[in-house]
Amino acid sequence: KNKTTTDATKSCVTPPDFGYTSAATINAAAAQGEVDLTADIFGPDLGSAVIGCNPNKAGCACQQKILKTVEQLASVKLAAFVKCKKAVLAGGATSAERLRECVSDDGTPGSIADDAKGKIAKTVGALNAAITKSCNPPGSAFPGTCTSLSGSTLGACLDRQVECRVCQIINEMDGI
């Protein structure tokens, strides 16, 4: 939060017409996105969804590993967007549409959809490996949107949830 506010104070004396809202909006969007993604994974009642480590070490480890990897996936996707956004702006972008292409246009170099360096695919692979290694079978460990799924099907579902939340975070942060 402090870094965002400090950067905004230094760099955004006169905010641009597109691609930026405010430090407060950016911080709120990031925090809400993380809360929403956690609810997507564990459902609305986090208290009953979390598996305690004392009675069920394996279930607890499964949830912790997957949550950590899902958060890494969100970070990788957001980092790809930010890098693409910087390149597009440096290239003279004059509209929010050009920034939107950094999310879903695989023809835009560096976009999330492009994943030219394979960082997103690598993290999705790590997610699937973690599910197989730490959560076999996951059972009721993830009672949210992807409930009752396992293996790569669970991984694909979690990846879709991350993609959705990352897009919502970007839309809120950048007003696009």
Residue spans of the language-model regions?
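Soluble, non-transmembrane alpha-helical interaction regions
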Residues: 1-176
